[in-house]
Amino acid sequence: MNRFNTPVIRCLQYGSITLATSALFACGGGGSSPNGTINGTVAVGAPMQNGAITLVCKNGSANTTTDAGGAFSVTFKFDGPCSITAAGGAITLHSFAPGAGTVNITSLTELLLSYLAAQLGTTVTNLLARLPTNATYQNALTNSTTIANAEAAVATIIKNSYGITLSSSAFLTTAFSVGQGQDKDLDLLMAAGAIDATGKPVATLTTTVTTAGTAAGGGSTGGTQGGGATGGTGGTGTTP
């Protein structure tokens, strides 16, 4: 498996914690926010080395970097859910954390977000940007049933489109490392042409997933207006 290297991006915020060889800076979510840890792996068929990880939560935010195996871990005061962006070289991937625990950032989480955004009647860009303030989106991304159903839908589409059965449909929160589990799934998807050179799912696959998400949401557009909207359902994270 080939690996790619990216420059370490440092972000200065209040407070700092040194984790192994990676620099981490976290901004607390206020005195009432609990201290929690979010960890996982960033990969696209190869681990993202020294990738810059940015987390923006309902309350609190943090930055860290991935190690040589694409793994990251950050402990800070926050209230979920959190949007997560991983950037390294030409590759940028997105994911989310319902709360503390293991969450991965992969081409599969890009598809998961496409499905959930369409189900909510919005776009991935809008979903992530408004997640810290929009109650509808927060509810949707902190409900285990909705997330599990969305993961299952994505897994089914991949099976039907490419004949690939994922090692686990719970790909958001299932821990993995280089050469096993979800990492092998990503290798197969890249070989099948489901993932492009930037780590993003190809347009045809994204369109199929988005169409399915829209159908699951019944064409809802209620979450796209006003940060204080209510309603929707979503999922919870798991700890490794």
Residue ranges and their predicted role:
Residues 15-16, 58:
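Generic detector of short alpha-helix boundary/capping microenvironments
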Residues 28-240:
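Feature for extracytoplasmic/surface-facing segments of secreted or surface-associated proteins
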Residues 22-26:
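C-terminal motif of bacterial Sec signal peptides marking the signal peptidase cleavage site
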Residues 16-20, 51:
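N-terminal export signals
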Residues 2-15:
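Bacterial N-terminal signal peptides that target proteins for export
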